[in-house]
Amino acid sequence: MKTCLLFFAALFSTSALLAEPAKVRLWPDGAPGAKGLEDKDQPFIYLWPAAKEKATGAAFVVCPGGGYGGLAADHEGTQVAKWFNGIGVSAFVLHYRLGTNGYHYPIQLMDVQRAIRHVRANAASYGIDPNRIGVIGFSAGGHLSSMAATLFDEKPASMTQDAVDQVSARPDVAAPTYPVISMIAASSHKGSRKNLLGPHDSDELAKQVSTELRVTPQTPPTFLFQTDEDSVVPAENAVSFYLACRKNGVPAELHCYRPGPHGVGLFLGDPVLGTWSGHLRDWLRNQGFLRPAPRTAISGKVSVNGAPVSWGSIVFTPEDPNAPVACARVMKGSFKLDAKTGPVLGKTQLTVSYSAADVPGLETPDGTASTQEQKPGSGSWTLLINADHPTLDLKVER
């Protein structure tokens, strides 16, 4: 086992230096159910390690789409891996087995489970945190990522029983992207169902892999991206998964943009649609996925020139750009955050925003307030957050 870890460590460090990523087969001795020894028969991952100077210790398994009949391995694989590297996250692009090559459910579930288990089992050699491994997938790969998030305890009969398979396959976060979700609804993608289920297709089996029906409170926090214009995999898929997360108390965030066809990938050239990945990065940051940090409850009062701020916000932005940002609404001069949502300990930039209506002296000559003059005000300070002092009395003089 030690030799194996050293081998993966060498591969990972070499991959970080070269333009071409290293390739690792998930079952070195042969995948269960394989029909041959070619790449199409033996699932593998490409390793895209984050540069050491940027690495956060987080990682993602990336599942390209293609209707379970092909793999959009560039714009839904390589490009995504490079984007993750840019925010300090190591990426592992999964080449799973396809229905067009004679592989059907549960083979694909086994492949994504094995990828997550492999990354977690080799976390030390890869320089990542075994408790910060996410899964992202696009289109049919989005369905695969949603199966990883909901069926992580499923153990297909043909599953191997080596040391890697004893490791948890549950991802710590999931990001199904314009995903196929339902295999039974009118909005389902018929081609994905055909390729996934193959000759064993039945309504009962299709229901088993309709992941909106498989969400439980143990499903990991989930981020979803979708476009309303998508006519190939309609938005009802992503929405149904989001609503299932809400029903089960799973933290979830859905971004549904109006324009945009199916299969856009990152689409960074679009000034609007291309912002979705930035929202994903912010979400990961505030989940504590990029940088786990101790947080503290805090409450207090905010006043301007002696008068309580009637309506505003207070934001705690930590010095570490990867640590979570905390924000609270100020109402009637008061705010409160619990230990789960409060600021991280340490040096923090504090920003308070408020209505200029809270600042005396902005009245018109006849004594009435002018809405044109009531522009928002703000102030920013640096302070040290200490759990021993959970209250803050902030007095702003203007």
Give residue spans per PLM region.
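N-terminal cap/lid segment of alpha/beta-hydrolase-fold proteins
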Residues: 20-58, 185-188, 216, 289-292
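Short beta-strand element of the alpha/beta-hydrolase
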Residues: 56-66
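Catalytic nucleophile-loop/oxyanion-hole region of alpha/beta-hydrolase
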Residues: 72-74, 78-80, 93-130, 268-274
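Primarily recognizes the serine-hydrolase "nucleophile elbow" in alpha/beta-hydrolase
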Residues: 114-192, 206-211
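Acidic catalytic loop of the alpha/beta-hydrolase fold
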Residues: 182-183, 229-233
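Short beta-strand/loop motif that positions the catalytic acidic residue
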Residues: 218, 223-226, 230
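Glycine/proline-rich low-complexity segments that form flexible loops, beta-turns, and polyproline
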Residues: 291-398
